[in-house]
């Protein structure tokens, strides 16, 4: 079920009503009905769409609450300064789960997300469970039907479980099994968060991955080169971040809190090798769970990641 954006979420400190250099995002955001959006001849600006769904988390035996994530992130983002002076910033609202099967909600989200991807230079998709990634892939493939897609996931988990239905832990297996013209790179894998069968599947499918342990102090030149080579080798990049990759000291409000997780600045450093590329079709950020957040710490962290990713 799709609902348009809620203006009441977008509030913040008012420094000026006339000087754009003092504006914050709540002063520049607009709202549109994404279901009625016509294709633009020239993509521009930024589109935001929420995936207010945690059904996949529940099916994956995780702790629920991430369906409230998109609104919490938008509220935190609203008060940040508009340093980029975006020519267009549109909150398209959220998609909610009201179907019998999760896959039907994913397909509904994908149809709408594809419109934003086709119409904007940047599209941010806010979760919600990490089953958003499969929906993001469907949207990407709709916009780019023949191009090679490189999927980059900053995550503690492979999320390549073999299940009978979509869950927050199956997205990337679904992608790899359905589409031979995709490859998968995972940054931040937790050795204690993935079974041997998942490592075996990664070997079988030639999934490139980097352990979290290799990223705790710095991002080495070897890893930077790996990312840049992966970006170079693909026509389109689908970029996604699962917030459970970040240590719970910084991100307590997630579906599965991390022990020995990454520092936020490490995630930013990794993203610097990805975001500047014009190949990035969209960015999704998943598993922000307000139910377990402290002082809105995790919502603010996601909001600041989006803020840093604006270009």
Curated annotation (Swiss-Prot):
Catalytic activity: N-formimidoyl-L-glutamate + H2O = formamide + L-glutamate
GO MF annotation list: agmatinase activity; formimidoylglutamase activity; manganese ion binding
UniProt: Mn(2+) 1 binding residues: 130, 155, 159, 242
Similarity comment text for this entry: Belongs to the arginase family.
Sorted UniProt keywords: Histidine metabolism, Hydrolase, Manganese, Metal-binding
The record's free-text note on cofactor binding: Binds 2 manganese ions per subunit.
Enzyme Commission no: 3.5.3.8
Entry-linked InterPro entries: HutG, Ureohydrolase, Ureohydrolase_dom_sf
Protein role: Catalyzes the conversion of N-formimidoyl-L-glutamate to L-glutamate and formamide.
Biological-process GO terms, alphabetical: L-histidine catabolic process to glutamate and formamide; L-histidine catabolic process to glutamate and formate; putrescine biosynthetic process from arginine, via agmatine
Residues reported to bind Mn(2+) 2: 155, 157, 242, 244
KW Metal-binding (keyword) present: yes
NCBIfam families: hutG
Pathway as given in its UniProt record: Amino-acid degradation; L-histidine degradation into L-glutamate; L-glutamate from N-formimidoyl-L-glutamate (hydrolase route): step 1/1
Reported cofactor(s): Mn(2+)
Protein name as annotated: Formimidoylglutamase
């Amino acid at each position: 079920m799709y609902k348009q954006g809620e203006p009441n979420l977008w509030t913040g400190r008012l420094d000026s009503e006339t000087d754009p250099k003092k504006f914050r995002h709540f002063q520049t955001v607009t709202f549109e009905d994404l279901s009625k959006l016509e294709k633009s001849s020239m993509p521009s600006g930024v589109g935001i769409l929420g995936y207010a769904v945690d059904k996949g988390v529940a099916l994956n035996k995780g702790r629920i609450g991430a369906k409230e994530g998109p609104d919490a992130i938008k509220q935190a983002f609203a008060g940040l300064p508009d340093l980029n002076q975006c020519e267009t910033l549109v909150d398209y609202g959220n998609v909610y789960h009201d179907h019998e099967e999760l896959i039907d909600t994913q397909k509904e989200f994908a149809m709408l997300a594809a419109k934003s991807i086709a119409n904007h230079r940047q599209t941010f998709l806010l979760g919600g469970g990490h089953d958003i990634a499969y929906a993001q892939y469907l949207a990407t493939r709709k916009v780019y039907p023949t191009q090679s897609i490189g999927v980059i996931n900053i995550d503690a988990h492979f999320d390549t479980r073999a299940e009978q239905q979509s869950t927050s832990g199956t997205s990337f297996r679904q992608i790899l099994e359905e589409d031979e013209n995709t490859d998968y790179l995972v940054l931040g894998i937790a050795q204690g968060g993935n079974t041997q069968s998942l490592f075996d599947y990664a070997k079988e499918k030639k999934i490139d991955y980097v352990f979290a342990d290799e990223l705790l102090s710095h991002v080495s030149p070897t890893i930077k080169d790996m990312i840049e080579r992966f970006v170079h080798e693909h026509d389109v990049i689908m970029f996604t971040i699962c917030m459970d990759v970040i240590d719970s000291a910084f991100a307590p409000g997630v579906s599965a809190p991390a022990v020995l997780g990454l520092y936020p600045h490490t995630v930013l450093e990794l993203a610097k090798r990805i975001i500047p590329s014009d190949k990035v079709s969209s960015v999704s950020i998943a598993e922000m769970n307000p139910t377990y957040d402290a002082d809105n710490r995790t919502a603010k962290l996601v909001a600041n990641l989006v803020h840093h990713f604006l270009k």
